Regions:
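Extracellular ligand-binding/catalytic regions of CAZymes and related secreted enzymes
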Residues: 1-110
Length: 110
């Protein structure tokens, strides 16, 4: 919430259990020290986040840079492609999307 995420945002999936091959991005590091790798630092993860907005809008965000590269795996017959197909199908329908209700006071996110 401290960086502008609306209060009704839902984390619908999160990665975890990363090895020490995964490290924080350089933007998150002020000073490098031991323990900033996947088995030690809880910040090393990718979250999928969903929230609704005004006028029946919504936002889906994948926290992984590899999300797009996973789509063509196995000829697009995989769980990431199915997830995206379900999202596009839901977002293309008329009417409200499922999820937490957006209220006008939340436009003051900061």
């Amino acid at each position: 919430l401290e960086r502008g995420t609306p209060p009704h945002a839902k984390i619908i999936a999160s990665s975890g259990g990363h090895t020490d091959n995964y490290v924080l991005v350089c933007e998150e590091v002020l000073y490098a020290f031991p323990g900033m790798t996947g088995t030690y630092d809880h910040r090393i993860r990718a979250d999928m986040v969903y929230f609704t907005s005004s006028n029946n809008g919504a936002v889906f965000s994948s926290g992984s840079i590899a999300f797009g590269q996973a789509l063509p795996s196995h000829g697009f017959n995989n769980n990431v492609s199915k997830l995206l197909a379900n999202l596009v199908d839901a977002f293309s329908k008329d009417g409200p999307l499922p999820g937490g209700k957006w209220v006008s006071e939340e436009k003051q996110w900061r």
